[in-house]
């Protein structure tokens, strides 16, 4: 094969496999808040399986644990601290408007 006709080969970077987010000793349970809180966004939403890098079974168990913790009031359904601060600061300070008749 001639050098000019050879396909361009990319340089291969070294690849290090990331550690799984859930170790074998971790219990997926609604009471295990340190584990559950890793899989919730800042807004209080459950992160997707692709973001979490979990297996299908692990994601299903995490989702059930989060929902159970929400029902038992261990976790909020929504985390709207930023929205609450905004509505508090934009509250009207003026009195009632005078109506024109």
Curated annotation (Swiss-Prot):
One of its GO terms (molecular function) is structural constituent of ribosome. It is found in: Plastid, Chloroplast. One of its GO terms (cellular component) is ribosome. One of its GO terms (biological process) is translation. Keywords: Chloroplast, Plastid, Ribonucleoprotein, Ribosomal protein, RNA-binding, rRNA-binding. Disulfide bonds: none annotated. InterPro entries: Ribosomal_bS18, Ribosomal_bS18_CS, Ribosomal_bS18_sf. Its main location: plastid. Part of the 30S ribosomal subunit. HAMAP family: Ribosomal_bS18. Belongs to the bacterial ribosomal protein bS18 family. This is Small ribosomal subunit protein bS18c.
């Amino acid at each position: 094969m001639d050098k000019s006709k050879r396909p361009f080969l990319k340089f291969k970077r070294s690849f290090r496999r990331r550690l799984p987010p859930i170790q074998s000793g971790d219990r997926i349970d609604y009471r295990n808040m340190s584990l559950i809180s890793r899989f919730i966004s800042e807004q209080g939403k459950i992160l997707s399986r692709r973001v979490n890098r979990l297996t299908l079974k692990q994601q299903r168990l995490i989702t059930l644990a989060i929902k159970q913790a929400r029902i038992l009031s261990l976790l909020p359904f929504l985390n709207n601290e930023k929205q609450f601060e905004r509505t508090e600061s934009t509250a009207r300070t003026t009195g009632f408007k005078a109506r024109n008749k």
